Amino acid sequence: LLHLLGSGGFGSVYKAIYHGATVAVKKVKRCSKNHLASRQSFWAELNVARLDHNNVVRIVAASTCTPASQDSLGTIIMEYAGNCTLHHVIYGTGYLTGNNSDSLKCDHGFLSTAQAVIYSHDIVAGLMFLHSQLIVHLDLKPANIFITEHNVCKIGDFGCSQKLEDSESSGLYICHQGGTYTHRAPELL
């Protein structure tokens, strides 16, 4: 592990090297208050494990084998999508996790209308692909849209996602209370 990129409700993400490639490693913590929710989050992340799309963060590997000394349910190794999220660009926060290291700096500057259209196209393409695979993200927000060094948006953080069995039987009945309250769709409030 090279350094911490960020942390959230169910774990921490680190920049690392795996078989010579730069990756992001998510360690899903064992939540003592809500063990079921942390387990569900770990397995939900793996909904996209076999998928490959330019606008979706790719899962490289995963393991539930962790040392007993660690308070972890498992580890997920993902492609490294970069230091910057759409949240950083929209709100002008240029550093990850409050660290002022140049290696963690996000230098995207002002978001022009033209760039917003390009980013929107990337996000819609990723969502269309996920929906074609019967996966709903359920926590789509600027902080979960990563911007690569090639200026491509990738949807990440699938800890709240659901894989639908088939579109006819479950497409209209998504009942979900996770995700970020301030970014929920109105029909889920």
Swiss-Prot record:
Its EC number is 2.7.11.1. Keywords: ATP-binding, Kinase, Nucleotide-binding, Serine/threonine-protein kinase, Transferase. Residues 1-189 form the Protein kinase domain. It holds the Pfam family Pkinase. The active site is at residue 139. It catalyses: L-seryl-[protein] + ATP = O-phospho-L-seryl-[protein] + ADP + H(+); L-threonyl-[protein] + ATP = O-phospho-L-threonyl-[protein] + ADP + H(+). GO terms for molecular function: ATP binding; protein serine kinase activity; protein serine/threonine kinase activity. Disulfide bonds: none annotated. The keyword Nucleotide-binding applies. Belongs to the protein kinase superfamily. Ser/Thr protein kinase family. This is Serine/threonine-protein kinase mos. It comes from Atheris nitschei.
